[in-house]
Amino acid sequence: FALNLAFNGEGVASPQEAALALAHPGPERVLLAFVAGEPAGFLCGLLKRSACYSRPSAEVTELYVCPGCRRQGVARQLLEAFLDACRQEGVEAVTVLTGEDNAPAQALYQRMGFSPSGEAHFEQGL
């Protein structure tokens, strides 16, 4: 909960809501990383199956590493673990959305083989 709150701010799932979601897993995968026995970061990702495509797809929806644990390979390890899980599920491609101004994240994704998709991202608040 504390890592999610630090990353996303107000409006995050409460510890009870998160526990309920984790107790009834759906397409979401949540990975935690620890450094010296303390939570250091997390990755949330979705494995998506569609009636339109023969192979599942996946998306990294959240990736956060505590400031004091950055530049130690934590994000890379989380991402590698998620990519391995995706390969085991038959996923052919993984997408990730990050801020245009988040140069460190963009550099990480590019080092790990991701490339800009050229697709426009649209959102409508409800």
Place the predicted regions along the sequence by residue.
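Conserved GNAT acetyl-CoA-binding A-motif
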Residues: 86-98
